[in-house]
Amino acid sequence: MNPQPLRPVIYDEGRDVVRVLDQRRLPSEEVWLDLASCDEVVQAIKDLTVRGAPAIGVAAAYGLALESRRGAEPARLREASERLVHARPTAVNLAWAVRRMSRRLGLGPAALLEEAHAIRDEDEAACRRIGALGAALLPPRASVLTHCNAGALATAGYGTALGVVRAAVEGGNPVTVFADETRPFLQGARLTAWELKRDGIPVTLLTDNMAGWLMAQGEIACVVVGADRIAANGDVANKIGTYALAVLAAYHHLPFYVAAPWSTVDLATPDGSAIPIEERGDEEVVTLAGQRIAPAGVPARYPAFDVTPEPLVTAIITERGVVRRPFAPGLAALAAR
């Protein structure tokens, strides 16, 4: 394991900037960007410079702290809060972090920065607890399939789905990972593979259409994914393609685990039909690495997320505990803790 922790969002108090690792440029180069205003944080979230539900929540919290430290009054901070919440509508952690910061808007810059630091620290601690609980579910020497990137890059640090993998390895279970490339943004190919290679964890890259065959051949022991929103009934919104993996896992009788912090659970959303699904521009689908791969004039769809119905989910792993079906009472019980 790499002894240097990977944290994609940092607040530089000396220069009053939010520093983010530009995830659009990985794995070719590691470039850190200094965001000097809340509007720059909003844009970084929109254009996927920083991505992953918990990570954008941390970035938003720091964006509001930054705006306050630069003299913004509460009314202006409330306007900035609205822009942040609407930057990406599916990930509930973003709205959760902004709501939490909003309760302290009138307390001054120091209080807001303290709260942003707390959101960051609590998320990393949650990821480590999720990792420990999830690692206990993995068979010895398991081959784990994951989708998108639910690692340190997507959180304050350590990761959710990849936190489970890291905790297993740290605990002496030499698991290996199959990473879906995750078209069209290639989070699996560019980010998950990069993270795991950095930590010395064996990873094999798959195109998105290979998982079913490898499951049929007995090469995959389980699926572990992250989440952008979990409804009260256990339906899970995550990166597009997750639903298809869950169907395949169910057909092949493989466990399908969802690892996410409690801030991803949205008990105000009754089921997956109420989760807004972000639609991104088709340019991201018809181009690859700056080159057009489809004929000019051919339209494309890009729903950035899908919803996995709760019957396809084996368990939801949060820092508060592991929940199995029926999810509604289990999640409600965890909420009462």
From Swiss-Prot:
Catalytic activity, as annotated: 5-(methylsulfanyl)-alpha-D-ribose 1-phosphate = 5-(methylsulfanyl)-D-ribulose 1-phosphate
Active site, UniProt feature: D228 (proton donor)
Record-listed substrate binding positions: R51, G52, A53, R88, Q187, N238, K239
Job of this protein: Catalyzes the interconversion of methylthioribose-1-phosphate (MTR-1-P) into methylthioribulose-1-phosphate (MTRu-1-P).
Protein name (database record): Methylthioribose-1-phosphate isomerase
Coiled-coil residue spans: none
Organism of origin: Anaeromyxobacter sp. (strain Fw109-5)
Upper lineage: Bacteria, Pseudomonadati, Myxococcota, Myxococcia, Myxococcales
A single GO molecular function term of this UniProt record: S-methyl-5-thioribose-1-phosphate isomerase activity
PANTHER family registered for this protein in UniProt: METHYLTHIORIBOSE-1-PHOSPHATE ISOMERASE
Sites marked Transition state stabilizer: C148
Listed pathway(s): Amino-acid biosynthesis; L-methionine biosynthesis via salvage pathway; L-methionine from S-methyl-5-thio-alpha-D-ribose 1-phosphate: step 1/6
Keyword field contains Amino-acid biosynthesis: yes
